[in-house]
Structures are given as C-alpha cells and as structure tokens.
C-alpha cells in the first residue's frame, strides 16, 4: 500500500491500524540538535485523543508517545525520528456482527474493491485513529516553527447551522467544542447532545491560522503552497472541502472587493490592508496570516438502522455499534494544526535550500 508518506525534505511516514498493536510515525529530515520537548508532543496528543469529553468517542486510549529512535540526550540526532503510540483499549468484538457488511459512508467497499481484502476492525488503516501519528509528527514540526516565530491556532468555526460570531482565542480550550465563541459553544454542545439522542452525528467547519509565516514559501505551478495545504488537509479523514482566505466567497465578489491592496508596514516590510487571499499569492506565502478552513462531514458511524449490502451484494440492514464520535470537530482542531505545521516546516526547509 503506497501513499503512507507526506513531505519532501521533512518527510513523514505513518503506519498502524485502529485495532492493531499500535500506530506510529517515522520522520526523515528532522534537523539535528533540536531540543525536543516530549511534554509538548504529549500535550498535542492529549488534545486529539478519544474519551476526553462527551463530544468524542468513549474509547479510552492514553495515547502515550514513545520515542524509538532519532533522539539522544534530549536532542534530535538528524537520523530517522520514530515515535510509537500503542493501542490499549480496542474492542474488536464490536465489529464481528458486521464484518461482512458494508457500512454506509465508510471505506469498506472501496478497500475491498482495491485490495480484495480488508481489516474490518474499526476500518483498519482507513480509521481516523491514524491521525494520532500525524499529530505527533506535527508537534515536532511546531517546535521547529516556533524557533522561527511561526505559530498556529485552530478552532471550531461552525457546527451545522451554528457559527461562531466572535473569535476569542482565549476561549478555545475552555469548552469541549473548542469554539472561540463561548455562547455559541454552549449551543453547539446542546446540538450534539440532541444528535446523539437521535442516534445521529453532525459535521461542520474548522478554521486554522498560521502567523509569523515569512514571504516566499511555496513553489510555482504544481507545488504551490495552497496546493500543498489542500493535499494535506484533504488527506484527513472526513474532510470534504478546503478553503483558503475568502474561499468560495471569492466567487461572489468583484475584483475590486477581493483584491488586497499593498501597504508598507510600520517596520518597513510589505503587507496588505486586507487578507482575502489568506496569506498566499501565486502559490507563495505573502507574509500575511495564512487562513484555512476545513469542512468535515458528519461521522459515518451512527447507531440508526441503515440499508446496505453484504460482500456478495445481497441487501441487508446494518446498525453500527461500538464507540464513535458524534462529531469530529473538537478532535479535528489539533489534526488541522498538525497538518499545516507539517506543510510549513517542509516549505521552510525547501526555501533554505532554494537560494544562497
């Protein structure tokens, strides 16, 4: 199975399944000498892990990271940095009754069509549990970016018809929806609770921002920064749309409204007075804040009875049991941050190699 690696100079390869021994990631190209803060890596994994609130799956996994190689006396060695996260609370018996049925909205049929064989336990490799490995790698990338003054923040912007009306970043970690508007967060929580009672699930939008990004990151034509971001974000399970800057709203604007006028900042650098472009022009970072939005579908695993077929194509009904998220949004927040961090650190390293 190809397609398990991402990046060029800072390249990650993830491995593992939802109900296997564990998951992990190998990072090639991590610069030597980085003082690696393991507590910071664990903190990001804790934000993504299951069982942290009633907005997430009831599966209990500590997601404790183990460094297997690439670190000595607290610093990276420049060799492959390998990290392991063990599975300790898988309950594979939940899937015994449906292992021959195709779950609506899942990759069961497409995996069978491609490989002729699949791991039916929690989706195997297609499970969103794989993103734990990405978050671990992204936490390393964030530490490198922090040395350059680059920071990232993400939050739940909307859930169904409910949308944050204010963006107070101090409120993001103060509620279980990771919404920057505390009043709307309470409405979101109630909406998810109702969906759970209805044996249903909900989708929405996560917004992620990167600040302190210098101008010049990204390559022309096929490796544009926005193309790389799209690649990264669309690889996240459940993500169905990605917008940068004004996104689809740009299609409703005139050029005079969508253009960002150039200005000279107080420090003498060049910037823009607005940011409809989302910090990227011609596929290259402009030094303005990078703004990305991800639309996530409702989780496909719901406890309602649904119609389907079995592997022989015979009609059947299915009820997906087990422990599942009623919405992916709170846990998508750290995953989105991680993927943007991975794109940016790779582009930073490429830019350093691009000119004397």
Curated annotation (Swiss-Prot):
SUPFAM superfamilies: Chorismate synthase, AroC
One GO CC term on file: cytosol
Cofactor binding note from Swiss-Prot or TrEMBL: Reduced FMN (FMNH(2)).
Gene3D superfamilies recorded: Chorismate synthase AroC
One Pfam family of this chain: Chorismate_synt
Superkingdom assignment: Bacteria
EC number assigned by the record: 4.2.3.5
Keyword list, A-Z: Amino-acid biosynthesis, Aromatic amino acid biosynthesis, FAD, Flavoprotein, FMN, Lyase, NADP
Pathway the protein contributes to: Metabolic intermediate biosynthesis; chorismate biosynthesis; chorismate from D-erythrose 4-phosphate and phosphoenolpyruvate: step 7/7
Binding residues for NADP(+): 48, 54
InterPro entries the record matches: Chorismate_synth, Chorismate_synth_AroC_sf, Chorismate_synthase_CS
Annotated binding of FMN, by residue: 125-127, 282, 297-301, 323
Membrane-crossing segments per the record: none
Cofactor: FMNH2
GO biological process terms, semicolon-separated: amino acid biosynthetic process; aromatic amino acid family biosynthetic process; chorismate biosynthetic process
Annotated GO MF terms: chorismate synthase activity; FMN binding
Oligomer status and interactors: Homotetramer.
NCBIfam families registered for this protein in UniProt: aroC, PRK05382.1
Family recorded in the similarity comment: Belongs to the chorismate synthase family.
Role summary: This reaction introduces a second double bond into the aromatic ring system.
UniProt name for this protein: Chorismate synthase
Species: Herpetosiphon aurantiacus (strain ATCC 23779 / DSM 785 / 114-95)
């Amino acid at each position: 199975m190809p397609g398990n690696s991402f990046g060029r100079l800072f390249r990650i390869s993830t491995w593992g399944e939802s109900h296997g021994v564990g998951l992990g990631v190998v990072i090639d190209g991590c610069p030597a000498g980085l003082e690696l803060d393991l507590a910071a890596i664990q903190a990001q994994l804790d934000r993504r892990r299951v069982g942290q609130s009633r907005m997430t799956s009831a599966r209990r996994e500590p997601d404790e990271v183990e460094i297997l190689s690439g670190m000595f006396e607290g610093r990276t060695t420049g060799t492959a940095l390998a990290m392991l996260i063990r599975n300790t609370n898988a309950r594979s018996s939940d899937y015994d009754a449906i292992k021959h049925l195709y779950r609506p909205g899942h990759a069961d049929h497409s995996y069978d069509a491609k490989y002729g064989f699949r791991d039916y336990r929690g989706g195997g490799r297609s499970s969103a549990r794989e993103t734990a490995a990405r978050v671990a790698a992204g936490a390393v990338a964030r530490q490198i970016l922090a040395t350059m003054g680059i920071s990232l923040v993400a939050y739940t912007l909307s859930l169904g018809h409910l949308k944050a009306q204010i963006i107070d970043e101090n409120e993001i970690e103060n509620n279980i929806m990771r919404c920057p508007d505390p009043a709307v967060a309470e409405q979101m929580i109630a909406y998810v609770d109702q969906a759970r009672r209805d044996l249903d699930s909900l989708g929405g939008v996560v917004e992620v921002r990167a600040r302190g990004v210098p101008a010049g990151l990204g390559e022309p034509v096929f490796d544009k920064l926005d193309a790389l971001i799209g690649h990264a974000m669309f690889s996240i399970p459940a993500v169905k749309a990605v917008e940068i800057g004004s996104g689809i709203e740009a299609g409703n604007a005139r050029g005079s409204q969508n253009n960002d006028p150039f200005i000279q900042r107080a420090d003498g650098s060049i910037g823009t007075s607005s940011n409809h472009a989302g910090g990227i022009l011609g596929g290259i970072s402009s030094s303005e804040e990078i703004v990305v939005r991800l639309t996530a579908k409702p989780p496909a695993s719901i406890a309602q009875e649904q119609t389907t077929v079995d592997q022989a194509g015979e009609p059947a009904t299915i009820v997906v049991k087990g422990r599942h998220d009623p919405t992916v949004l709170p846990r998508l927040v750290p995953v989105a941050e991680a993927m943007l961090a991975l794109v940016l650190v790779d582009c930073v390293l490429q830019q350093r190699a691009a000119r004397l």
